[in-house]
């Protein structure tokens, strides 16, 4: 699968497929476009997981735990992406706030 095809999966809303497709590619190649695809697929996946984390059920807590792991990865990845607009850094900030509010809501 190519990076272009992965971005197409994202556009089609096939978040999990796109995320699962980029992971093995990113493990062996950290080029400009692969890194961007990894970043945006991880953002999509984190948003999906935060939507699942709604209560203290095992599924919700597992989703929240996975979202936290992805967030830490995004914090490491964002500075490596050439992003003159600052949208990657802003996205990480916004996701941090979303993660914090979800964590508070779920853990109450």
Where do the protein language model's features map onto the residues?
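Alpha-helical adaptor scaffolds
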Residues: 11, 26-40
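Alpha-helical segment of the N-proximal tetratricopeptide repeat
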Residues: 1-21
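Amphipathic alpha-helical repeat scaffolds of TPR domains
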Residues: 1-4, 35-54, 86-105
